């Protein structure tokens, strides 16, 4: 597969690759990801037991979620298109004595293999690829019947723009400026439609709410900004 055929935004890839060495610094540029990671794990564990499950973490970055899943008993494969992030993930997992199969790989290549997974996570990735529907379709092709797929992304509305771009990037400096492109945000209805066209069935959508005074995230019924969705393939 040539680079032009891959579902990759080269500018987005370079942007996150540049953050590789700061990925595991909880007080650094990836601080919001460190804060949100326990909430993502909490949501996944509400939907399915992790122990002994084969999990594919798509767009694993430096391995924050992959390590959390592994520590809770999952057998984890993490894939990302950034070599520098995969190197960081491998080195950190080795330091933690965790056995995680990290690959610098396009998910479309994985669909040609025989392995299928009990759980697939695709967190904070859909809004950073040129064709999110294609990404969802490839995830659907890799899940076992009855398996669970988890996506997290950002709703597209004025409130989400204010919170995630104006607030997070420019007012509170929680994220590097330019992290998000509003045009790439995704309505829950769009996500559901794309997933259903790939043979998936929606089980749950839950919001993620940021408490600025507590400086922490939690699950919420409000899906107007950040949200998580769980699907199954039957």
UniProtKB/Swiss-Prot annotation:
Protein name according to UniProt: Ubiquinone biosynthesis O-methyltransferase
Keywords: Methyltransferase, S-adenosyl-L-methionine, Transferase, Ubiquinone biosynthesis
PANTHER family in UniProt: METHYLTRANSFERASE, UBIQUINONE BIOSYNTHESIS O-METHYLTRANSFERASE, MITOCHONDRIAL
Any GO molecular function: 3-demethylubiquinol 3-O-methyltransferase activity
Catalysed transformations (reactions): a 3-demethylubiquinol + S-adenosyl-L-methionine = a ubiquinol + S-adenosyl-L-homocysteine + H(+); a 3-(all-trans-polyprenyl)benzene-1,2-diol + S-adenosyl-L-methionine = a 2-methoxy-6-(all-trans-polyprenyl)phenol + S-adenosyl-L-homocysteine + H(+)
Cross-referenced InterPro entries: SAM-dependent_MTases_sf (IPR029063), UbiG_MeTrfase (IPR010233)
Organism name: Coxiella burnetii (strain Dugway 5J108-111)
Residues noted as binding S-adenosyl-L-methionine in the record, renumbered to the chain: 40, 59, 80, 123
């Amino acid at each position: 597969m040539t680079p032009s055929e891959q579902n990759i935004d080269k500018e987005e890839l370079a942007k996150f690759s540049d953050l590789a060495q700061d990925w595991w610094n909880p007080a650094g540029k990836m601080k919001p990801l460190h804060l949100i990671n326990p909430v993502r794990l909490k949501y996944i564990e509400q939907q399915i037991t992790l122990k002994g499950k084969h999990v594919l973490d798509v767009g694993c970055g430096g391995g924050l979620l992959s390590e959390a899943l592994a520590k809770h008993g999952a057998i984890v494969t993490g894939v990302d298109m950034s070599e520098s992030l995969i190197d960081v993930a491998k080195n950190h997992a080795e330091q933690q004595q965790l056995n995680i199969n990290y690959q610098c790989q396009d998910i479309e290549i994985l669909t040609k293999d025989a392995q299928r997974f009990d759980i697939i996570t695709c967190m904070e990735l859909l809004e950073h690829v040129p064709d999110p529907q294609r990404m969802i379709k490839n995830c659907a092709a890799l899940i076992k019947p009855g398996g669970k797929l988890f996506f997290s992304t950002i709703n597209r509305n004025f409130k989400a723009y204010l919170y995630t771009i104006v607030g997070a990037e420019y007012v509170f400096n929680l994220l590097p400026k330019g992290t998000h492109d509003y045009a790439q945000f995704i309505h829950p209805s769009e996500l559901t439609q794309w997933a259903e066209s790939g043979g998936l069935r929606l089980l749950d959508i839950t919001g993620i709410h940021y408490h600025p005074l507590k400086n922490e995230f939690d699950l919420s019924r409000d899906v107007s900004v950040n949200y998580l969705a769980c699907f199954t393939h039957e």
